[in-house]
Amino acid sequence: MFEVFSRGYYLGRLYVTPTDGDRALMHSEQHERINEEVYATGDGLERLDTPLVMKLETRHFPVHGADDVPTNTLALPESMLEGTSVRNPPSLQEVFLARRERARQLLALAGT
């Protein structure tokens, strides 16, 4: 789903669609699998519900898992879609996934 893009990011394509909620969501099983593959260190017990950090165009945001989101879909609040090039959702878009260290930096800056 995601491939290496740079030292700080992976690149993938997801269907981007609006949600009525107030946070970014993706299917919970995909969220856990990506969390395990990208963010887990393999040292002891690790949480797999830690938010993923993604970037659409110029905006970073934490992504949480939800059972009601279709697979291969990124559900974003309307406010996050404003000012983007997403038209007529669901729209297949390139999305960046921050690597583990970059995600930690971004979450620390956001106070999450």
Regions found by a protein language model. Name each.
Residues 1-112:
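Long, compositionally biased stretches
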